[in-house]
């Protein structure tokens, strides 16, 4: 069923979401990464990217924050582009683990594959697969170019965050070498880990992430730049991964309450994809106990519920002038 709203009405809903949520004091910044602990906890922004390229944004949508685990979506897309859907399914997988995003136990339980590119083990494996094999500099160029194409503008490496991540990524070092033990990493483990750490340290804005989400929702064509970033056949694959594990062990609760596949990161960003309709992103540093932005979750839920939209329903948003 079509749900028609004017652009002005949609802007009003996004503004309402911001106003409703901005005073929420729940959660706290990630404190195990020094850089993230010191980010202003009051920063908050929401951005929506329609498939015609129009964007609606309220609050701190131009502030560059650490992309963190939202980057897993971007690199999963790059791996899908370079290898195809079947090879990624065979070598990495697409299953939720039901365990925390940085779980080592998940590797031990399913050592035939890392489960999904959207948890740490699968993301490190995906970084190892990025072509060309054996060339860290060219791999990095490919990762950054892919993020740029998805977002419609370039990210910026946050050097201080990269240092913080590198100094504290002991668990991920264990993951990389355990993957090597099970032949589930496809380049030098230390190189793959460094690429993963750097990609998590990219600085992006909520506006950029909404455009990236819009690119997925638009079947691989960036709504703003009009560039075809990836083949339309891959859009349902990456969206399925996001729907299955975007909020890790709390993904079921998220899908039940919001109705939109979304990926979260401990930098405070959440990126949601409503196929054929729009991309949405929100950012606020304070996190809940599972590492998900409290305000970003509430803001996206508000927009979805206010508009009566759900990926599992037949409601379809039509924005008219």
Swiss-Prot record:
Chain positions recorded as substrate binding sites: 69, 120, 165, 172, 196, 248, 266
Documented EC number(s): 3.5.1.2
Molecular function via GO: glutaminase activity
Top-level taxon: Bacteria
Catalytic activity from the UniProt record: L-glutamine + H2O = L-glutamate + NH4(+)
Biological processes per GO annotation: glutamate biosynthetic process; glutamine catabolic process
Record carries keyword Signal: no
Keyword field: Hydrolase
Stretches that traverse the bilayer: none
Enzyme kind, highest EC tier: hydrolase
NCBIfam families xrefs: Gln_ase (TIGR03814), PRK12356.1 (NF009020)
Name the record gives this protein: Glutaminase
Source species: Bacteroides thetaiotaomicron (strain ATCC 29148 / DSM 2079 / JCM 5827 / CCUG 10774 / NCTC 10582 / VPI-5482 / E50)
Lineage: Bacteria, Pseudomonadati, Bacteroidota, Bacteroidia, Bacteroidales
């Amino acid at each position: 069923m079509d749900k028609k709203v004017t652009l002005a009405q949609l802007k009003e809903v996004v503004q309402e979401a911001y106003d409703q949520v901005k005073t929420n004091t729940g959660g706290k910044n990630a404190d195990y990464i020094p850089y993230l602990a010191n980010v202003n906890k009051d920063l908050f922004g929401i951005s929506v990217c329609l498939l015609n390229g129009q964007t609606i944004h309220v609050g701190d949508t131009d502030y560059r924050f650490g992309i963190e685990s939202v980057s897993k979506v971007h690199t999963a897309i790059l791996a899908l582009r370079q290898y195809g859907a079947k090879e990624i399914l065979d070598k990495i997988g697409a299953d939720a683990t039901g365990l925390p995003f940085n779980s080592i136990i998940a590797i031990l339980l399913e050592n035939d594959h890392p489960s999904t590119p959207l948890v740490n083990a699968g993301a490190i494996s995906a970084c190892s697969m990025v072509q060309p094999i054996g060339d860290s500099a060219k791999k990095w160029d490919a990762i950054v170019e892919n993020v740029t194409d998805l977002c419609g503008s370039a990210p910026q490496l946050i050097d201080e965050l990269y240092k913080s991540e590198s100094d504290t990524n002991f668990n991920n070092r264990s993951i990389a070498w355990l993957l090597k033990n099970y032949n589930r990493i496809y380049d030098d483990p230390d190189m793959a880990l460094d690429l993963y750490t750097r990609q998590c340290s990219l600085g992006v804005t909520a506006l950029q992430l909404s455009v990236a989400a819009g690119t997925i929702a638009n079947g691989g064509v960036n709504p703003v730049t009009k560039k075809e970033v990836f083949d339309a056949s891959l859009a349902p694959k990456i969206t399925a991964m996001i729907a299955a594990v975007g909020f890790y062990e709390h993904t079921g609760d998220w899908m039940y309450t919001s109705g939109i596949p979304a990926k979260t990161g401990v930098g405070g960003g959440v990126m949601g994809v409503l196929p054929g309709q729009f991309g949405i992103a929100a950012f606020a540093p304070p996190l809940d106990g599972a590492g998900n932005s409290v305000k970003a979750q509430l803001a996206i839920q508000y927009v979805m519920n206010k508009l009566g939209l759900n990926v599992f329903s037949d409601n379809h948003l039509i924005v008219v002038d």
